[in-house]
Amino acid sequence: MAKANEIKRGSAVSYNGKLLLVKDIDIQAPSARGASTLYKMRFTDIRTGQKVEERFKGDDILDTISLTRRSVNFSYIDGDEYVFMDDEDFTPYHFKKEQIEEELLFIPEGGLPGMQVLTIEGQVIALELPQTVDMVIEETAPGIKGASASARTKPAKMSTGLTVQVPEYISSGERIRIHIAERRYMGRCD
């Protein structure tokens, strides 16, 4: 049991008879005095895969479920299944493409360090990514000299199909860091 304001992204809760995995949380602070802060949570139903959205007050009590997290690396593709290998005991974890379609946009060809598989009682629930990923820009409009003074952005496409907005001075072939949850440019990589 935990209060709604203690729930974090990647947690699992039981609510209205459903097992839900927290994908995103929006915090809405009230403008009136005495009103309580609202937590708008977006979930994925673990059993059905459906997206669910609920609102909670900060002191609402939710029933939390303990998850097991295992560090994994991307191994290979088998038909429409993606196989991830446990870093310690080499257990393979299989995901259908539909299950991890969003996550695949952030996994470059060489893999992504820091990935984890979430399980409940041995059942694979989800693939969790780290907060940031470093990727090389495949395609963007040419960089403009002296554009660092302006705050204008342009779209940049990565090899995985992901498109993010980058500053005008960034060129194709540059390595950038992307914040995964917010899908935004954070800076250049060394």
From Swiss-Prot:
Pfam families: EFP, EFP_N, Elong-fact-P_C. This is Elongation factor P-like protein. SMART domains: EFP (SM01185), Elong-fact-P_C (SM00841). It comes from the Bacteria. GO terms for biological process: peptide biosynthetic process. InterPro entries: Elong-fact-P_C, NA-bd_OB-fold, Rib_uL2_dom2, Transl_elong_fac_P/YeiP, Transl_elong_KOW-like, Transl_elong_p-like_YeiP, Transl_elong_P/YeiP_cen, Transl_elong_P/YeiP_CS. One of its GO terms (molecular function) is translation elongation factor activity.
